[in-house]
From Swiss-Prot:
Belongs to the bacterial secretin family. GSP D subfamily. The N0, N1, N2 and N3 domains are periplasmic, while the secretin and S domains form a channel that is partially inserted in the outer membrane. The N1, N2 and N3 domains each form a periplasmic ring; the N0 domain was present but not resolved by electron microscopy. The secretin domain forms a double beta-barrel structure; the outer barrel has a diameter of about 110 Angstroms while the inner barrel forms the central gate with a small pore in the closed state. It is found in: Cell outer membrane. Forms a cylindrical channel with 15 subunits; approximately 25% of the particles have 16-subunit channels. Closed pentadeacameric channels are 180 Angstroms long and 145 Angstroms in diameter. Each subunit turns in a clock-wise manner around the channel. Induction: Silenced by the DNA-binding protein H-NS under standard growth conditions. The gene is gspD. Keywords: Cell outer membrane, Membrane, Protein transport, Signal, Transmembrane, Transmembrane beta strand, Transport. This is Putative secretin GspD. Residues 189-263 are annotated as: N2.
Length: 650
């Protein structure tokens, strides 16, 4: 077998010997019959003076016969063609070596980097990088792939950031693709055209036309190069159109129909409002129209600015409607604003709970002594000094009664508590004692419903007269000036419904009353509890606004020195006053957002039913009284059971 291979190699060498004697004019013949392909490659490399590397996957035999002779260059191309027939390709390496590989692996093994000065010839495997100037590489690459033979070696890829094509394949095929690229990558017939608009807005028309072009691309898959590009110049109210001649002609024809003067007929509309107040919207819409006039005034010619100046907005309070006179574009924008403002505003039910509990007690106890010869032990803070009491008793014994002239008259009239004693001879003793216990429970639950961002107030109380001044006239007549102060429960609230279910509440809460325990001669004393703040509360939740926990304790002792300190006996020489009070005050708030009629109706029915039940319980409690309860008024049970009337149509 080894001898046979040697014979075959010798025959191949003989067949591939040059037919002429001069190297520069060497002619080669090629006749192979069932020759080993690897040995064939080695022999060709020897005659071409090339180092050829053979991939291990290259195996098999070849058979070819040629009746012509070739030059060295023709012989090399013949060598490449033979390998191509058997599914192999030759790659030129950077160091000048040749490498024989399977054609299927050529896509992952780029060939010699060729250019216009060294493009490669024939079946030589090359790679060309072609930059494009006028055509997007992304659009051209798929077309070039279709022009390559289905079974040919090579590939076409694009790199979009640099807008280049990377071509790999046989030099003959790549050179043909280069010719195609040169013919396609040329500056088209695009030109720029400026169209000045007389009536329409350049920005508005540019937006409309670009939208039409975009939609036509989506439906017909029209290439971007064949369509027009439109840019608006706001300063000159012009459109700059670039693109092919036919595309520009279509846009120009369309602009002739769009850039026309708007008709002034039928530009007055009446908008009937459902929720908003017409008089309140006039100022808002006037501001919007002025803004539109400022934005578009500079973009329009003087001949077309008159329509913008003739904007009139009037409110009709009787029908709660708006009468607007303006051109079509302004009408559409104002109609959009009206639709967003004329909406049903949310309402808020605000319920406040004021709880106050007061508990106090006091004890006043004292003993006073008096002697005509020695002196007295007197405590004036008891409200009944012993000297005044002794003088009153003496006048009583002398006159047989007590009159307003008696010095003890005023003291005994204003004194609260027990007073006991005796006045006999030179001695007198007076015992005063008073125990007090005060309790006060207050529970107020004011509630009110108001619109979003609308101030609402609630006031339940009395007007109490307060003496503010007194003047004596020339005829000794006294002229008094009286002011009235409202006491009771006051609630002021402004709700603001935020995104979601949160409510911002600005609250002023006051609970006031007249202090009945005060004995001031200057006028009544008022108890006032006031809170003013802003809170953010979620709908339906009860939160505390503020509160006060007050614990008051006071003890006062008046005594005779030394004698008052004697155990037990010292009680006869002292006056003791003890006072203690506790007060707990808390204020709560609960908002409920009302967005529709069903929620409002449900809340109203709940409160109506609760108060009716309380009223019914009171009437039932009076059924056994002497006065009959059958004629007492009571809330109707079926008020919320009847259907609400149908809304009237305008």
């Amino acid at each position: 077998m080894k001898g046979l291979n040697k014979i075959t190699c010798c025959l191949l060498a003989a067949l591939l010997m040059p037919c002429a004697g001069h190297a520069e004019n060497e002619q080669y013949g090629a006749n192979f019959n069932n020759a080993d392909i690897r040995q064939f490659v080695e022999i060709v490399g020897q005659h071409l003076g090339k180092t050829i590397l053979i991939d291990p996957s290259v195996q098999g035999t070849i058979s070819v016969r040629s009746n012509d002779t070739f030059s060295q260059q023709e012989y090399y191309q013949f060598f490449l063609s033979i390998l191509d027939l058997y599914g192999y390709s030759v790659i030129t390496l950077d160091n000048g070596f040749l490498k024989v590989v399977r054609s299927a692996n050529v896509k992952t093994s780029p060939g010699m980097i060729a250019d216009s000065s060294r493009p490669g010839v024939g079946d030589e495997l090359v790679t060309r990088i072609v930059p494009l100037e006028n055509v997007p590489a992304r659009d051209l690459a798929p077309l070039l792939r279709q022009m390559m033979d289905a079974g040919s070696v090579g590939n076409v890829v694009h790199y979009e950031p640099s807008n280049v094509l990377i071509l790999t394949g046989r030099a003959s095929t790549i050179n043909k693709l280069i010719e195609v690229i040169k013919r396609v990558d040329v500056i088209g017939t695009e030109k720029q055209q400026i169209i000045h608009l007389e009536y329409a807005s350049a920005e508005d028309l540019a937006e409309i036309l670009n939208q039409l072009i975009s939609e036509s691309h989506g439906k017909s898959q029209m290439p971007a190069l064949l369509s027009a590009k439109i840019v608006a110049d706001k300063r000159t109210n012009s459109l700059i159109i670039s693109g092919p001649e036919k595309a520009r002609q279509r846009i120009t024809s369309l602009l002739k129909s769009l850039d026309v003067e708007e008709s002034e007929e039928g530009n007055t509309r009446v908008y009937y409002l459902k929720y908003a107040k017409a008089t309140n919207l006039v100022e808002v819409l006037t501001g919007v129209s002025e803004k539109l006039k400022d934005e578009k005034g500079n973009a329009r010619k003087p001949s077309s600015s008159g329509a913008m100046d003739n904007v009139a907005i009037t409110a009709d309070e009787q029908t709660n409607s708006l009468v607007i006179t303006a051109d079509q574009s302004v009408q559409e924008k104002l109609a959009t604003v009206i639709a967003r403002l004329d909406i049903r505003r949310a309402q808020v039910l605000v319920e406040a709970i004021i709880v106050e509990v007061q508990d106090g007690n006091g004890l006043n106890l004292g003993v006073q002594w008096a002697n005509k010869n020695v002196g007295a032990q007197q405590f004036t803070n008891t409200g009944l000094p012993i000297f005044n009491a002794a003088q009153g008793v003496a006048d009583y014994k002398k006159n047989g009664g007590i009159t307003s002239a008696n010095p003890a008259w005023d003291m005994f009239s204003a004194y609260n508590g027990m007073a006991a004693g005796f006045f006999n001879g030179d001695w007198g003793v007076l015992l005063t004692a008073l125990a007090s216990n005060n309790k006060n429970d207050i529970l107020a639950t004011p509630s009110i419903v108001t619109l979003d961002n609308k101030l609402a107030s609630f006031n339940v109380g009395q007007d109490v007269p307060v003496l503010s001044g007194s003047q004596t006239t020339s005829g000794d007549n006294v002229f008094n000036t009286v002011e009235r102060k409202t006491v009771g429960t006051k609630l002021k609230v402004t709700p603001q419904v935020n995104e979601g279910d949160a409510v911002l509440l600005e609250i002023e809460q006051e609970v006031s009353s007249v202090d009945s325990s005060s004995n001031s001669t200057l006028g009544p004393t008022f108890n006032t509890r006031t809170i003013q703040n802003a809170v953010l509360v979620k709908t339906g939740e009860t939160v505390v606004l503020g509160g006060l926990l007050d614990d008051f304790s006071k003890e006062q002792v008046s005594k005779v020195p030394l004698l008052g300190d004697i155990p037990l006996v010292g009680q006869l020489f002292r006056y003791t006053s003890t006072e203690r009070a506790k007060r707990n005050l808390m204020v709560f708030i609960r908002p409920t957002i009302i967005r529709d009629d069903d929620v409002y109706r449900s809340l109203s029915k709940e409160k109506y039913t609760r108060y009716r039940q309380e009223q019914q319980q009171r009437i039932d409690g009076k059924s056994k009284a002497l006065v009959g309860s059958e004629d007492l008024p009571v809330l109707d049970e079926n008020t919320f059971n009847s259907h609400a009337p149908a809304p009237s149509s305008r």
